[in-house]
Each structure stands twice: as C-alpha cells, then as structure tokens.
Amino acid sequence: MATKQSVTTREGDRIAIVAGLRTPFAKMATYFHGVPAVDLGKMVVNELLVRHGVQKEWVDQVVYGQVVQMPEAPNIAREIVLGTGMNVHTDAYSVSRACATSFQSTVNIAESMMAGTVQVGIAGGADSTSVSPIGVSKNLARALVDLQKTKTLGQKLNIFKRLSLRDLAPVPPAVAEYSTGLSMGQTAEQMAKTHQISREEQDKLAHRSHSLAAESWEAGKLSSEVMTAYAEPYKAALERDNNVRFDSKLEGYAKLRPVFDKKYGSVTAANATPLTDGASAVLMMTESRAKELGYTPLGYIKSYAFAAIDVWEDMLMGPSYATPIALDRAGMTLNDLTLIEMHEAFAAQTLANVKMFASDKFAKEKLGRDKATGEIDMDKFNVMGSSIAYGHPFAATGTRMITQMLNELNRRGGGSGLLTACAAGGLGAAMIVETE
C-alpha cells in the first residue's frame, strides 16, 4: 500500500480549487478551425480571471499544457501570461503528459503550494487538432539543412537532385505511438478482444455518455463552467460542445463500421472520442489565501497518483494502476467515493478498466495486491457523461473533469470524487477531490 498523502502547505493549508472554466469543445475542423491552441488557452484564462474578479498581480504561477505542440509557441503557459495582461514577472512553464496533461499541470501548481513558493496559480491545458504542425519528409528536411551550407547554384541543384516527388509531400502529425507504431485505436481494439468487450457493450456506453451529457446541458448544469466562445470571423458564437448527440438513439450506433480492424473489429467513430479542439483552466489557491481574498473554494485536492505501464499490451489500462495508489494515499476505498469519472478515450478502454477494477486476478498478478480495487457502482460512474460525448482536446480534459466533478459534488451536497484517465505512452493518472 502507498503511504498516506498530505496535500497541504507547511502551515496545514489545503490546496483549493477556487474556480474552473472551459471553452465549449468542438470537433476538429468545425467552429475552432484555424484557431491555435495558444489562442484557445488565452481565451479561457482571460475569461476565468475576469469572471471571478482575479487581479492579475495576484497570480504567482501559471502551469499549462499542450499535446499537439506548435514550434512557434513552445511555451504555451508563458504566451498565456503575456497575452492576458498578467504581470510580466509571473512565472510560467508548460507541461505535457498526453491525455493526462492538465492533471499534471494541476499537480505541479499544488506541489509548488505545498513547497511554499506559490499561493495563487492557474493550471490547465489546450489543444487544437485543427491547427497541427505539418512536417516535411526526412529527406527534404535534410536537404533544406544542407542548402544552408551551399554557395553555388550547382551545389544547390545537386542537393535538389537527391529528392523525389514523394519527398516533397507534406507529412501530417503522427497518430501512432513512437515506440510501438500502434495507434490508440489499435490498442483499444486489442483491449476489446483481450477482455471480451463486445460491440454492443461499447455502443451502450457511448449512448449512455451522450444521453447523460445532453441531459446535463439541458438541465443547465454546465452553463456556469463553459464560457461562450467567439472565434474568427466572429459571425456566430459557440455556447455548447458540438459533439454531444442530443438525439442519441442506441440503434444508430450499430450502423457504423469498425475503423481500426475493419473485418473483426468493434471500435467505431461512435464509441470513441473524436479529435477535438478546446481549452480549460482552474484557479487554485492555498486555503488561507482564498479566505483572505474572500473566495469560497469549489473543493480541495485530497490525493493524486500517476502510473506507467507497458505499451505493447493494454496500454490504456492506466486508471487501473493509478487509482489504487490514489485511494491508498487518501486513506479511502472505492466504496467511500461519492462519484467517479473515468476519461472515456474509447468505450472499449473504459469498460476494460471497469472490469479490472473488480478483478482479484488482475490485482494479484499486475498490482501485487491481495484483492481488487473494487467493483464500480455504475450509479456513481460518469454521471454526466464523459469524453465520448464532450470530446477530448488532449491537454484540456483533466481540468475539464476536475471542474465538472467539483460542481456536481456541490450540487449533491458535498462528498468526494475520483477522477482518472489513461494516456498515451502507457501512462495513467488518478486524483481524488473533496468538497465541504
């Protein structure tokens, strides 16, 4: 068992999530087409500061993340500081932990507070799959470097003669793991087959996610945590996530064909998250600083954990490894939790993790534990839907989940919630938050 964790400052202050906000999430090449992640990040952070009356000189540190990196803005956090009018001396750095990026940025702010160097911070993440770095072939890249060393026209022509027409074609961002060559979708297919997750089960989970997300939007639950976005050419606003199916019908999911294993597969575009654009952020303070400034926190971080596993098989099983560590560090069991949200990269991955949470065999063979983490009560699980419905701008999902969980716990009268996510590279994240 992991040692119990104390997420407090040296003076005993808890680490507070004071507020959270996100843009609506939009499918790739729709509303935010042409809007880079740095602009999405500036948009949401500026609105967060204005909406909650935060004087910009209060902010000691910004930690922000991005997965689809743009070479022209490698430190998105610093660009957000400079682009929102914060004090130029505000410390800012960027992080990347694939789909768990904004869990990492939140933890980094928390750990700075625990160390006593920060009292007010902003964490979050943004991604745009609509504005991606388009590369060139290795041969062309090498030729362009060599051209800089040439002096004569003849030398330049000799370099160009080495190139074929294929070398001149643009190279889109890779969708496969660098270490294995496998895509996330291929891993989801492997997990579906290995853990016997049927197509029907996957479609049912996707339908459930869309239905609960639609209900949450219609009930007004998300209106306070999702800003209205205005993007160029400013002809229309976006107020809601445009991936949510407000008319979801289970029978419609069966019509789609598998994407990653066309003959024997079960993972489709409907039971997986789409490529998405969006940004999110949370305002964090030490408990005493929040009280001093007159803020009532949404809640507090109780524990957190990260895990890393093999990438060749079950690469998206990170939640099953990280969660028991976070529970131990909180001194809790799965049954103690009020709510649970697990990031839905794919329905297959989500359901495989749900199975492993309840598996004594998995606990003994993979975790070295005597018994399973526990069987998830589905009445507590992803009660507002999750990423299959809302979408998944990679770096923005973690702080989307934190804000959404704390607001829902407060609506229910308080309690504790588990947030957990898989991530590329065989990574996993888990965080337990609590409200008064």
From Swiss-Prot:
> What UniProt keywords are attached to this protein's entry?
Acyltransferase, Cytoplasm, Fatty acid metabolism, Lipid degradation, Lipid metabolism, Transferase
Query: May I have one GO cellular component term?
Result: cytosol
PROSITE patterns for the chain: THIOLASE_3
Against Gene3D superfamilies, the record matches this protein to:
3.40.47.10
Where does this protein act, in terms of pathway?
Lipid metabolism; fatty acid beta-oxidation
Per UniProt, the enzyme's principal EC class comes to transferase
Q: Name one Pfam family in it.
A: Thiolase_N
- Entry-linked SUPFAM superfamilies: Thiolase-like
Reported EC number(s) for this entry are: 2.3.1.16
Q: Which GO terms describe its biological process?
A: fatty acid beta-oxidation
Catalysed reaction, written as an equation: an acyl-CoA + acetyl-CoA = a 3-oxoacyl-CoA + CoA
Main localisation, per the record?
A: cytoplasm
In the UniProt record, does the keyword Isomerase occur?
A: no
Where in the sequence is the active site?
Answer: C99, H392, C422
| S-S bridge residues | none
Q: Cellular location of this protein? A: Cytoplasm
Q: Which domain of life is it from?
A: Bacteria
Single annotated GO MF: acetyl-CoA C-acyltransferase activity
InterPro entries per UniProt: 3-ketoacyl-CoA_Thiolase (IPR050521), Ac-CoA_C-AcTrfase_FadI (IPR012806), Thiolase (IPR002155), Thiolase-like (IPR016039), Thiolase_AS (IPR020610), Thiolase_C (IPR020617), Thiolase_N (IPR020616)
Q: Which HAMAP family match?
A: FadI (MF_01618)
Question: Which protein family is it in?
Answer: Belongs to the thiolase-like superfamily. Thiolase family.
Functional note = Catalyzes the final step of fatty acid oxidation in which acetyl-CoA is released and the CoA ester of a fatty acid two carbons shorter is formed.
According to the record's subunit comment, the protein's assembly and interactions are: Heterotetramer of two alpha chains (FadJ) and two beta chains (FadI).
Q: What is this protein called?
A: 3-ketoacyl-CoA thiolase
**Per the UniProt entry, what species is this protein from, by scientific name?**
Alteromonas mediterranea (strain DSM 17117 / CIP 110805 / LMG 28347 / Deep ecotype)
This chain is encoded by the gene named fadI
